[in-house]
Amino acid sequence: GVQTCALPICMIDINKIPSPCYVMEEKLLRNNLSLIKSVKERAGVNIILAFKAFALWKAFPIVREYIPFSTASSKFEAQLAFEEMGSPAHTYSPAYTEADFPLILRYSSHVTFNSLSQFHRFYPMVRADGNRVSCGLRINPEYSDVETDLYNPCAPGSRMGVTGDLLGDTLPEGIEGLHFHTLCESTSYDLERTLAEVERRFGRFLPHVKWLNMGGGHLMTRKDYDVEHLIALLKGFKERYPNLELIMEIGRA
């Protein structure tokens, strides 16, 4: 179960804490969540929780007060979102199996595919399910500030997402959104440069889709993060593409 204490961690005798266990300071969590919610409301974007960085489900009742939705990368994370966050997941995985995909559909509101061939393979199952989920395609803007190629999803030869040259002038019927994930503990200026590349390589699609998921890596709770620049950047992008719902994934922040 969950034990609560009104004292800050600095005033608790850590030797009396049963081990092993997770210890979380609620005040600090709420401080971060309050900032994230403020960005969400001021910029008019949707910010969702990324389980890969924070999946302490006993804290979800607190998180839901600020962020009601989450992202998943497996059927089990999607189930966690549905059952413990109380909302269907925005799901992306580099690969799906036909055995697992019905569960992905059951627990998701959005499903992003890594390639066109993957979309064409599974879209009949989406249609058979009544088109309840919104389908997206992961794109590779061929630009990232990540310095180590091993962790760079845009490195030469990367198979994470579709490059612009592999797409024609229109997206296949059924694709309602685009998704990129190229940042890691990055700044708002990194996002600005990335969005410029997304517009340059995929701008022809942006007026015609419903949403753009900008992935994770937005460390907006870091002390030196320029939150005001982020809000202005997002507002400006929405002014150019008023049809788009902008989605950000928050994990470590």
Write out the residue ranges for each language-model feature:
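Generic structural "secondary-structure junction" signal
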Residues: 4, 19, 24-25, 153, ...
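A short small-residue
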Residues: 12-17, 176-181, 215-216
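Active-site anion/phosphate-binding pocket segments in diverse small-molecule metabolic enzymes
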Residues: 10, 19-23, 216-252
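Active-site-proximal beta-alpha core segment in soluble small-molecule metabolic enzymes
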Residues: 45-211, 233-236, 240
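Generic structural signal for well-ordered, non-membrane alpha-helical segments
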Residues: 22-29, 33, 115, 191, ...
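Short, small-residue-biased leader/transition segments that mark boundaries at the very start
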Residues: 1-7
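Conserved N-terminal beta1-alpha1 strand-loop-helix module at the mouth
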Residues: 12-33, 37, 42, 54, ...
